[in-house]
């Protein structure tokens, strides 16, 4: 059992016979009345997103999720990605729908954590940051940085990130996978 006060992003709960993952949460303490927790939940089976409010301190059954360390091996076709279990060396193919937005950051050899519930893959935890090479971006013109502007850049995995004007093709940049933001250059 887990209290609604202990909700964090990524927490999994069982509700109405299904598994839900907390995407967003907000503890609200109104001036009058009791505190409550406003959440945005994603159904791990169907992908549906639902907003729900719980009383502060309300207990719910927590879904026991197994975390397995796996390595991305290669993409298979347009919609599948093959991962290898680091302990048993078994390979498993996951679809783009299962990976969600994380698919655009996958680079061969990258280590990720696969989340399983009752032997079914329900999600993937990527590293918080990745270092990728810029393969396509507009050239920066000298004097463009007076206002600190940004421009779109495409990286080696196909993801598009907004970067400062001084970034050029071939540079390696650090990207935050949680919000798709540029963090800095890498050597």
Swiss-Prot record:
GO cellular component terms listed in the entry, alphabetical order: cytoplasm
Gene Ontology biological process terms from the UniProt entry: peptide biosynthetic process
Instruction: Extract the PROSITE patterns matched here.
Output: EFP (PS01275)
Q: What is its main location?
A: cytoplasm
**Gene3D superfamilies assigned:** 2.30.30.30, Nucleic acid-binding proteins (2.40.50.140)
The upper taxonomy is: Bacteria, Bacillati, Cyanobacteriota, Cyanophyceae, Gloeobacterales
Q: According to its UniProt entry, what is the function of this protein?
A: Involved in peptide bond synthesis. Stimulates efficient translation and peptide-bond synthesis on native or reconstituted 70S ribosomes in vitro. Probably functions indirectly by altering the affinity of the ribosome for aminoacyl-tRNA, thus increasing their reactivity as acceptors for peptidyl transferase.
As for subcellular location, the record says: Cytoplasm
Does the entry annotate any disulfide bonds, and if so which pairs? none
* Secretion signal span: none
Which protein, by its recorded name, is this?
A: Elongation factor P
**Which keywords describe this protein according to UniProt?**
Cytoplasm, Elongation factor, Protein biosynthesis
Q: Does the keyword Ribosomal protein apply?
A: no
Q: NCBIfam families, alphabetically?
A: efp (TIGR00038), PRK00529.1 (NF001810)
User: Annotated Gene Ontology MF terms?
Assistant: translation elongation factor activity
| Transmembrane portions of the chain | none
Q: Which family does it belong to?
A: Belongs to the elongation factor P family.
A Pfam family that this protein carries is EFP
Asked whether the UniProt record includes Cytoplasm among its keywords, one would answer yes
Q: Which pathway, metabolic or otherwise, does it act in? A: Protein biosynthesis; polypeptide chain elongation
Entries under SMART domains matching the protein? EFP, Elong-fact-P_C
């Amino acid at each position: 059992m887990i209290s609604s006060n202990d909700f964090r992003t990524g927490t999994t709960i069982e509700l109405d016979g299904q598994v839900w993952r907390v995407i967003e949460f907000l503890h609200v303490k109104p001036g009058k009345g009791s505190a409550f927790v406003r959440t945005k939940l994603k159904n791990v089976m169907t992908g549906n997103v639902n907003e729900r409010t719980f009383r502060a301190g309300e207990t719910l059954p927590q879904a026991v999720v197994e975390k397995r360390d796996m390595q991305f091996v290669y993409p298979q076709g347009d919609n599948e990605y093959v991962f290898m279990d680091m302990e048993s060396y078994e390979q498993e193919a996951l679809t783009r729908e299962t990976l969600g937005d994380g698919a655009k950051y996958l680079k061969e050899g990258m280590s990720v954590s696969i989340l399983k519930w009752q032997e079914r893959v329900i999600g993937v935890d990527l590293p918080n940051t990745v270092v990728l090479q810029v393969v396509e971006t507009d050239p920066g013109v000298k004097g463009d940085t007076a206002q600190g502007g940004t421009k779109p850049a495409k990286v080696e995995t196909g993801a598009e990130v907004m970067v400062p004007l001084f970034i050029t093709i071939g540079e390696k940049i650090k990207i935050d996978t949680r919000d798709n933001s540029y963090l800095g250059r890498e050597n």
